[in-house]
Amino acid sequence: MINSSFILLASTVTSKKVGRITQIIGPVMDVAFPSGNMPNIYNALVVKGKNAAGQDIDVTCEVQQLLGDNKVRAVAMSATDGLMRGMDVIDTGSALSVPVGEVTLGRIFNVLGEPVDNMGPVNATVTSPIHRSAPAFTQLDTKLSIFETGIKVVDLLAPYRRGGKIGLFGGAGVGKTVLIMELINNIAKAHGGVSVFGGVGERTREGNDLYMEMKESKVINEENLGESKVALVYGQMNEPPGARMRVGLTALTMAEYFRDVNKQDVLLFIDNIFRFVQAGSEVSALLGRMPSAVGYQPTLSTEMGGLQERITSTKEGSITSIQAVYVPADDLTDPAPATTFAHLDATTVLSRGLAAKGIYPAVDPLDSTSTMLQPWIVGEEHYETAQGVKKTLQRYKELQDIIAILGLDELSEEDRLLVARARKIERFLSQPFFVAEVFTGSPGKYVSLVETIKGFQMILSGDLDSLPEQAFYLVGNIDEATAKAATLQVENS
């Protein structure tokens, strides 16, 4: 049975309410409707007609304010070029609705749910409004469980919560996209789940690069779209603020269908959550609201909460969200990142230093955090191993200045041993990715949490002190490291 909030497309035609444009200010317009025919807040309005040059116009807007005198103020989801006062505006009678279900996999959509990949129309039988309430408290799954990703450094040191929200921090060129693609690949293989990628206010070139890389690594299967593991929703930097403000909700709505109807585990990527806030700030100013701290919208917390509260685990399935967070001027106290942090369960920080060393994924083991890393959630064994790894790496970090000035020989025997183990740990935190096989030539590895814990315990206990550190670089589990060490020994002898 289909959830009541997902609507089967039918050919019923209702009488439309028609209004007229009275004022246009950039992406915002005022529309007058006949008395008694006012649209509701969040209703979608459509402007169709011809501009002065005789070209067709088709602009969708969303009602934001009821102004009195039978007027509403609406925000456009596409450019308002060519619109004129007096043009007819049709009230669709409902909120923006977008296609949902398997037909969305392997395709790219805009904020309105229209395909923009030149691969023909989407034959959707079910659509859903983008404005929906969060699941009721009675539907929520309150059990704290780890979402295993198969990536050693994440699962051991900053584990993700099933149905949680993770912040992904990292500059350009440190491997954000590859990490995202590997997570999409692993959730499909290990959890039978799908992913939805929401490109919110980022560069068009990056969206195109991601699409091409997904096709190359078979995350999107062009020959058989049904086998694709991801749906893409883009609202790029050059689009009006209305589109950038709502594209996150479009992606979330598609993810909710997979969770609520298909009962799947879903990964929702939002790149970048800051742009969602930024677009809201632009719209707020255009609507004439009084700005709050640092010029942000007064409704910042409400808007963020409305999006984030819909991302959760229910008894049917889960949406686990990974959100790239841009920090303006590296100021963590800025209202936009500060409001985002309140919702995050874990942070994955990518380090340029590790990327420069060739250690991929370049996840910083000391800066990345998770609320799930508690002994009563993950178990004593996991917790103790993770703390041991962090302690060893922290001590190695402290000793690096001494090593740089005086050299390794000046360290005590105990510290030399610790440095050797730390370097093995650092290399063992790297692993070959499935989606990078085409570039590296080495097959990808999915490492279970049990194998991960066992491997790091053996390094910490000193069982593998005799093995060379290069044996631990870009391998899966610890057995591969010992096999690689044996191969290296044969080659060197």
Curated annotation (Swiss-Prot):
GO terms for molecular function: ATP binding; ATP hydrolysis activity; proton-transporting ATP synthase activity, rotational mechanism. Its EC number is 7.1.2.2. GO terms for cellular component: chloroplast thylakoid membrane; mitochondrion; proton-transporting ATP synthase complex. It is an enzyme of class 7 (translocase). It is found in: Plastid, Chloroplast thylakoid membrane. It catalyses: ATP + H2O + 4 H(+)(in) = ADP + phosphate + 5 H(+)(out). Belongs to the ATPase alpha/beta chains family. SMART domains: AAA. Transmembrane segments: none annotated. Produces ATP from ADP in the presence of a proton gradient across the membrane. The catalytic sites are hosted primarily by the beta subunits. One of its GO terms (biological process) is proton motive force-driven mitochondrial ATP synthesis. ATP binds at residues 170-177. F-type ATPases have 2 components, CF(1) - the catalytic core - and CF(0) - the membrane proton channel. CF(1) has five subunits: alpha(3), beta(3), gamma(1), delta(1), epsilon(1). CF(0) has four main subunits: a(1), b(1), b'(1) and c(9-12). Its main location: plastid. This is ATP synthase subunit beta, chloroplastic. Keywords: ATP synthesis, ATP-binding, CF(1), Chloroplast, Hydrogen ion transport, Ion transport, Membrane, Nucleotide-binding, Plastid, Thylakoid, Translocase, Transport. It is a peripheral membrane protein.
